[in-house]
Design a protein with these regions (language model features):
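Histidine-rich, glycine-flanked metal-binding segment
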Residues: 1-2, 7-50
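Divalent metal-coordination and catalytic microenvironments
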Residues: 6, 21, 45, 56, ...
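Hydrophobic/aromatic beta-strand patches that form the interior of the parallel beta-sheet core
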Residues: 39-41, 53, 86, 117
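Metal-associated gating/positioning segment near the N- to mid-region
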Residues: 46-110
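Histidine/acidic-residue-rich, glycine-tolerant segments that coordinate divalent metal ions
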Residues: 91-102, 108-160
Length: 160
């Protein structure tokens, strides 16, 4: 597929050639790459941007799926051009363990519409004090946060 008549983030004209579902070339005058039977889409001067990452999402699995679940969140993210999202731990129960984070990430992988990272709470169950669970977190847990609560004790935050 060849996308023509687009502009990049700087407002400059750009074409994209997509082969086998992946961007194979970005530039100008890419028609030679496409071939005669290739689909050509006219972007009509719209801006073409790379995928986005949302570092602060609330998909609410587990416990609050009536607000948003992994499938609806994944669909919304993909529709908006987001290929990766970071989920906050204010779920029920609070995501305070690697096992719970892995469960959410596995469910998201099964949906398969975007990459998902489940964050873990800084203090266990947002209790503001207990950080022992952090010692057991594997490297696969990339972020910790007390989303919306804040750690009120400076010493606890320093230890975390």
């Amino acid at each position: 597929m060849l996308l023509i008549n687009a502009v990049n983030a700087e407002g400059r004209p750009v074409e994209l050639y997509v082969k086998d579902g992946k961007i194979a070339a970005v530039g100008q005058d890419l028609a030679a790459l496409a071939g005669e039977n290739e689909t050509v889409l006219d972007a009509g001067g719209l801006t073409v941007l790379p995928a986005f990452v949302d570092l602060h999402c609330h998909w609410r699995t587990p416990g609050f799926e009536y607000k948003e679940d992994i499938e609806t969140g994944s669909r919304a993210a993909a529709a908006g051009g987001y290929t990766f999202v970071n989920l906050m731990p204010n779920t029920k129960p609070v995501c305070s363990s690697a096992a719970q984070a892995a469960m959410v990430e596995q469910k998201a992988a099964e949906v398969g519409l975007c990459g998902v990272n489940q964050t873990v709470s800084i203090t266990e169950d947002f209790d503001g004090k207990t950080i022992d669970h952090l010692k057991t977190l594997p490297a696969s847990v990339k972020f910790i946060t007390e989303d919306g609560h804040g750690v009120q004790d400076n010493a606890t935050m320093a230890k975390a």
